[in-house]
Amino acid sequence: MTDTVELAKGDIISVEVLRPAHGGEGIGHHDGRVIFVKGGIPGDVVDVEIAQLKKKWARGEVVKVTTASADRVDSRCPAAAAGAGCCDYAELNPTVELEIKSRVLRDQLERIGGIDELPEFELQDLEPTAGWRTRVRLGVDASGRAGFRKLKSNELVTEVACSQVVPELLEGLVGEGARRFTPGVEIIAAIDDAGQRHVVESRKAPRGRRTETVLKVLEGTGEVEQKVGDYTWKFPVSSFWQAHTKAPAAYSEFIAEALTGLELVDVDKRGPVAWDLYGGVGLFAPIITSKLQAAVHSVELSPGSAEAGEEALAGLPVTFHTGRVEGMASQLPSPNVVVLDPPRTGAGSDVLKSIAEAKPQLVIHIGCDPATFARDVADWKLNGYEMDQLAVFNAFPGTHHFETIGVFVRVS
């Protein structure tokens, strides 16, 4: 067994980055320890400054690239190059980005999910890979300048833009000659499907409150208009919507394909039923009703999002319920199909158990964090469901984030 050499915070060591890790880091080894390397790309040899130290592992940041990986490129994001926490994959060749992300997911599913045999991954790169973000949140410093937050810091990068964002969205908001805002507020800006830019000043919700406060509408109406297929949603700019301009259509198309040809068992003789959990404004409800001819019950915590869904989908057999998914499942009619899109923290054991007890034939589970998705996959297995399909969407190009959709079938 290799002896562990004494290290201290601030020490600089040489590490070869061997593989990617969840969270955008690279993994290497040094004298018996696993080293997590912020800014490391597989194939790099780097000097790493130790920031966190444990008995069996350490975490640090690249201070010098001594031998660059073949997949390392010049930074594609001015804001990230200036220290912003936006595009942590800005120096990774975009042609290998989705493959790196699929490796991270596979590792999480094997280690955390306990899945030995995985279905073949369906990999989808969403275009464009720059200028794809149609909504953004900016901090405002003490002098009123808006900018992008540095990683785990309140400091802002105010001089340059992030390459994720649609360029016209940031015009006059960030950089030289940009307007000034109220110090300490947050700027929310979006360009909607009608081509209208909306800019508001807001203040985050205080602890225990669900909604933030929009202090002032600076441009537009403050109510965005988003269109997918034949349906148009109108809701406050502060409400959730998919960041990538092509994501709503891409996810909807995958769900439509997963539901195509599904033979539903009508046990109660009252017609097919589907649940749309963490449903937001009901983005997926039209696809579900169209493919299954089912009554859809959507559960969403935000009253504003549910109201927007009711208005947009009036005439469809969709019922919106406002509340937490944890307390709502037992009150809904038994479903044939469940679609759920939980937050980054995942759905969790209690929610998945309550869904499984309702015995849906098919579950479509959307995840935006590979670790919590893998944890939920393990719970599906415990509750008698197995993964039938798996898709990975590079819906956040230039970052370590990605979207995963798993299709699960009941086997017991």
Swiss-Prot record:
Q: Which residues form the active site?
A: C368 (nucleophile)
Which PROSITE patterns does the UniProt record give? SAM_MT_RNA_M5U (PS51687), TRAM (PS50926), TRMA_1 (PS01230)
Which InterPro entries does its entry note? MeTrfase_TrmA_AS, NA-bd_OB-fold, SAM-dependent_MTases_sf, TRAM_dom, U5_MeTrfase_fam
What is a single molecular function from GO for this protein? rRNA (uridine-C5-)-methyltransferase activity
Binding residue positions for S-adenosyl-L-methionine = Q242, Y278, E300, D341
Q: What are the alphabetically sorted keywords of the record?
A: Methyltransferase, S-adenosyl-L-methionine, Transferase
Can you supply a Gene Ontology BP term from the record? rRNA base methylation
Might you give the EC number(s) for this enzyme?
A: 2.1.1.-
Carries keyword NADP?
A: no
Query: SUPFAM superfamilies of this UniProt entry?
Result: Nucleic acid-binding proteins, S-adenosyl-L-methionine-dependent methyltransferases
Q: Which residues form the TRAM domain?
A: 6-64
Membership in a protein family: Belongs to the class I-like SAM-binding methyltransferase superfamily. RNA M5U methyltransferase family.
Q: What is this protein called?
A: Uncharacterized RNA methyltransferase Cgl1903/cg2084
Species of origin: Corynebacterium glutamicum (strain ATCC 13032 / DSM 20300 / JCM 1318 / BCRC 11384 / CCUG 27702 / LMG 3730 / NBRC 12168 / NCIMB 10025 / NRRL B-2784 / 534)
